C-alpha cells in the first residue's frame, strides 16, 4: 500500500526530476496533485518544471559527482529521469545502495543510447527490427553503409529530437551524414548507428504502463515527424486487429525486460499486420502529449500513478484527438505570445504554453490540443490552432 507524506514537511514524499522540460512540467503537476514534494533539476535555470516545483537545482546531469551531491542533499524517495543525458552509471551505483530510480536505473542506462536498447530488443529478445550496424570511425561508418545498403538512416547513438539524424540516399551524402551525426550527438562526437531504411505504412507510439496491477496499453498514437522531431500526433491510430496484437506483444516484451514501474513510450513501425521495433523511452513521450486531451488519465498521470505503486485500472480514451507542436524560430530571452483568442475560438481546442525562458534557433514552445469526430478533423483543428498562436521575439 502506498503511503505519502505531506509536501514541505519532514515526512514529505520527495520526487527528484532529472530534466525539467515540458514533459517534466506535466509530471511535476501530477505529483503536486498527490501532495508529493517536487525537486526539479536541469542544466539551465527557470526550466518549465522548475516553475511548478517546490525547489530546483541547476547543474550538468552528466556530471556524476554533481548528481551525487544533489541526491545526497535531497534524499529523494523517487528519482524520475525526464531526459537521456544523465550520468546513468551513477544511478546504477546508487540504485544498488537503495535509491529508487524510475522505472529502474538499468532501463535508464540501456535507453540513454540506441545501442543498448537495440541490442536488447534484437539480440536478447529476438524482436523484429531494421538491419543495423554500429560505427565509431568514418572508415567503419562507410563500411557499415556499404553493408546495410542505400537508402539507410544514420543517427548518433545518443541524441534526441532528431539531432544528428539523416537519410543517406546516394554515395555523395555519406561523408556529410557522418559529419552531421558527429555534430548532433548529445555528448559530442562519437558512435553512430546505421539502420536499413524501413518501408512502413505508418509509425506509432504505443504508450505502455507497467504497474502494480499489470501491463496496460493506451490506444495507439500516430504521428508525423519532420527533421526527426514530432510535429503532430493523433489518437487512436487505425490499425488492424493483428497489428495491434503484434504491437502489444512487442511492447510488453520490451517493458518487462526493462522492468520497474512507470510509463514507457514504445516506438514502432507498422507495415500491414507486421510490426517492427524502433525505440523506447522509459518515460512519457512527446507524441503522447495528445493524451492531455484524449484520455481520462494523461500519460503523465499514468506515469506518476505507476511509479508511486498505485493501480492503473482501466485506461479510458475519449475518442479522436490530436496535438500539434507550437514551434518557435528566433532569438529571444523575452518571448511573447498572442493570437490565443483566435486559437481558442476553434471548437474543442486547448493550448499549453511551456514557459521556456528563451530561444536560440528552433524550439518547441507549446502544443495545441484538439478533439473531433475523426482523427483527421482533430488533427486539422490542432494544426489550425497551433498556427493561430503568434510568437514575438
Swiss-Prot record:
GO cellular component: cytosol
GO BP term, pick one: 'de novo' IMP biosynthetic process
Enzyme Commission identifier(s): 6.3.1.21
The organism's place on the tree of life at top rank: Bacteria
Coiled-coil residues: none
Record GO terms (molecular function): ATP binding; magnesium ion binding; phosphoribosylglycinamide formyltransferase 2 activity; phosphoribosylglycinamide formyltransferase activity
Family matches, as Gene3D superfamilies: 3.40.50.20, ATP-grasp fold, A domain, ATP-grasp fold, B domain
Domain ATP-grasp: 119-308
PANTHER family: FORMATE-DEPENDENT PHOSPHORIBOSYLGLYCINAMIDE FORMYLTRANSFERASE
Stated name of the protein: Formate-dependent phosphoribosylglycinamide formyltransferase
Organism: Vibrio cholerae serotype O1 (strain M66-2)
Amino acid at each position: 500500500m502506498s503511503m505519502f507524506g505531506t509536501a514541505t514537511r519532514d515526512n514529505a514524499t520527495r520526487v527528484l526530476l532529472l530534466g525539467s522540460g515540458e514533459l517534466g512540467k506535466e509530471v511535476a503537476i501530477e505529483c503536486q496533485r498527490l501532495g508529493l514534494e517536487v525537486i526539479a533539476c536541469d542544466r539551465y535555470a527557470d526550466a518549465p518544471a522548475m516553475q511548478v516545483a517546490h525547489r530546483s537545482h541547476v547543474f550538468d546531469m552528466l556530471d556524476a559527482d554533481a548528481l551525487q551531491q544533489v541526491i545526497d542533499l535531497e534524499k529523494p524517495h523517487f528519482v524520475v529521469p525526464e531526459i537521456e543525458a544523465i550520468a546513468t552509471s551513477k544511478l546504477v551505483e546508487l540504485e544498488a545502495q537503495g535509491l529508487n530510480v524510475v522505472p529502474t536505473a538499468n532501463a535508464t542506462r540501456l535507453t540513454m543510447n540506441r545501442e543498448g536498447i537495440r541490442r536488447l530488443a534484437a539480440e536478447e529478445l529476438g524482436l523484429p527490427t531494421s538491419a543495423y550496424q554500429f560505427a565509431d570511425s568514418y572508415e567503419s561508418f562507410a563500411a557499415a553503409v556499404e553493408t546495410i545498403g542505400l537508402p539507410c538512416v544514420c543517427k548518433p547513438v545518443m541524441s534526441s529530437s532528431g539531432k544528428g539524424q539523416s537519410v543517406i540516399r546516394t554515395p555523395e551524402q555519406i561523408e556529410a551524414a557522418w559529419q552531421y551525426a558527429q555534430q548532433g550527438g548529445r555528448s559530442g562526437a562519437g558512435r553512430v548507428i546505421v539502420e536499413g531504411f524501413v518501408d512502413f505504412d505508418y509509425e506509432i507510439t504505443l504508450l505502455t504502463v507497467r504497474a502494480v496491477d499489470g501491463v496496460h496499453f493506451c490506444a495507439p498514437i500516430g504521428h508525423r515527424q519532420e527533421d526527426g522531431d514530432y510535429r503532430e500526433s493523433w489518437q487512436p491510430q487505425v490499425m488492424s486487429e493483428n497489428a495491434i496484437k503484434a504491437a502489444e506483444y512487442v511492447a510488453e516484451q520490451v517493458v518487462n525486460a526493462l522492468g520497474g514501474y512507470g510509463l514507457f513510450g514504445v516506438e514502432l513501425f507498422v507495415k500491414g499486420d507486421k510490426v517492427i521495433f524502433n525505440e523506447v523511452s522509459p518515460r512519457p513521450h512527446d507524441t503522447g502529449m495528445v493524451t492531455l486531451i484524449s484520455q481520462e488519465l494523461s500519460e503523465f498521470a499514468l506515469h506518476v500513478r505507476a511509479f508511486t505503486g498505485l493501480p492503473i485500472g482501466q485506461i479510458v480514451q475519449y475518442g479522436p484527438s490530436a496535438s500539434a507542436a507550437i514551434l518557435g524560430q528566433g532569438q529571444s530571452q523575452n518571448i511573447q505570445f498572442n493570437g490565443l483568442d483566435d486559437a481558442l475560438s476553434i471548437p474543442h481546442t486547448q493550448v499549453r504554453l511551456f514557459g521556456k525562458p528563451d530561444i536560440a534557433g528552433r524550439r518547441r514552445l507549446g502544443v495545441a490540443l484538439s478533439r473531433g469526430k475523426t482523427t483527421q478533423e482533430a488533427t486539422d483543428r490542432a494544426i489550425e490552432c497551433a498556427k493561430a498562436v503568434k510568437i514575438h521575439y
